[in-house]
A protein has these predicted regions:
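Class I SAM-dependent transferase core
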Residues: 2-39
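Short, structurally constrained coil/turn elements
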Residues: 11, 39, 88-90, 184-186, ...
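Conserved Class I SAM-dependent methyltransferase catalytic core
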Residues: 18, 23, 32-35, 146-205
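Conserved SAM/SAH cofactor-binding pocket of Class I
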Residues: 28-130
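Glycine-rich, phosphate-binding/catalytic loops in enzymes
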Residues: 62, 130-134, 184-186
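Active-site-adjacent beta-strand anchor residues
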Residues: 69, 142, 168-169
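Mobile active-site "lid"/loop adjacent to the S-adenosyl-L-methionine
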Residues: 118-148
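C-terminal lobe and adjacent flexible extensions of AdoMet/dcAdoMet transferase-like proteins
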Residues: 206-210
C-alpha cells in the first residue's frame, strides 16, 4: 500500500475520523444508518465493510465490544489508525480484521448486532470503474443491486444470536421483491426503521431478526 491517507478529517459525536482516497467516504446513508442503530454497552457487535471505521467506533463509544471487517486493506489500516486516535473516548473496544464479509469470522463467534452498509448500486459490467482502485468493491451491487446483500443475509444464521438483530442499508434503485424473497428464504423477520428520500432514490434502513 503506497497511497498515504488524505489527512482529510471530520468529527462525529466527539470522534475524529480521518479519511483516505481509496475508501468510501461517509455519506447520507452512513449517517442514516448510525441514526437508526440501537447498540448498548452490553452488545457484542459485528460490522462488515467498515470503511473508515466510523460506525464501529461509534458503537465502541457507546460501550459495545466490536469486531469489524473490510476486504480493502486501506480500510483496515485506516480503521486501526482511527481507533488509536479515538481510544480515550471509547467505553468499548474494536478489533479490525481484513477479509470479505464473514470470511474472517471464526466458527462459534456470534453477535447481538450485525451491521452492514453494502454495495447496493445496480451495476452492469460495462459500468464498472475497473483498474486497481477499490471504488467498485464499495459500490457495485451487481445487476439487481443485491449481489452482496444476498450473501450477507444468507450468512446471518451462522453469526447472529437468536435474539439478536441485524441492520443494513437498502436503496430503492435495487430490486425490493428479490430482497423480500431473500429475507423469506432465510426465515428472517424485517422492518424498515428509518427511511429517507434523496432526489429520485429512497434509502431504507432495515432491521432484521429471527
Amino acid at each position: 500500500m503506497n497511497k498515504k491517507p488524505s489527512n482529510k478529517t471530520f468529527h462525529y459525536n466527539g470522534l475524529t475520523i480521518e479519511l483516505h482516497p481509496e475508501i468510501y467516504e461517509p455519506a447520507e446513508d452512513t449517517f442514516q444508518l448510525l441514526e437508526a442503530l440501537e447498540v448498548t454497552e452490553c452488545d457484542r457487535v459485528l460490522e462488515l465493510g467498515t470503511g473508515c471505521g466510523i460506525i464501529s467506533l461509534e458503537c465502541a463509544r457507546r460501550g459495545a465490544k466490536v469486531i469489524c471487517t473490510d476486504i480493502n486493506p486501506y480500510a483496515v489500516e485506516l480503521t486501526k489508525n482511527n481507533y488509536s486516535r479515538n481510544l480515550s473516548l471509547l467505553k468499548g473496544n474494536v478489533e479490525v480484521r481484513n477479509g470479505n464479509l464473514f470470511s474472517v469470522i471464526k466458527p462459534g463467534e456470534r453477535f447481538d448486532a450485525v451491521i452492514f452498509n453494502p454495495p447496493y448500486l445496480p451495476t452492469r459490467a460495462k459500468e464498472r470503474v475497473g483498474g486497481s482502485g477499490w471504488f467498485d468493491a464499495a459500490t457495485d451491487g451487481g445487476v439487481t443491486g443485491l449481489a452482496v446483500t444476498k450473501r450477507f443475509i444468507e450468512g446471518l444464521h451462522k453469526y447472529l444470536n437468536k435474539d439478536g438483530r441485524a441492520y443494513f442499508v437498502f436503496s430503492s434503485l435495487s430490486d425490493r421483491k428479490k430482497l423480500d424473497t431473500y429475507l423469506s428464504n432465510a426465515r428472517l423477520k424485517s422492518e424498515i426503521v428509518l427511511s429517507r428520500r434523496f432526489n429520485d432514490e429512497q434509502i431504507d434502513i432495515y432491521r432484521v431478526h429471527f
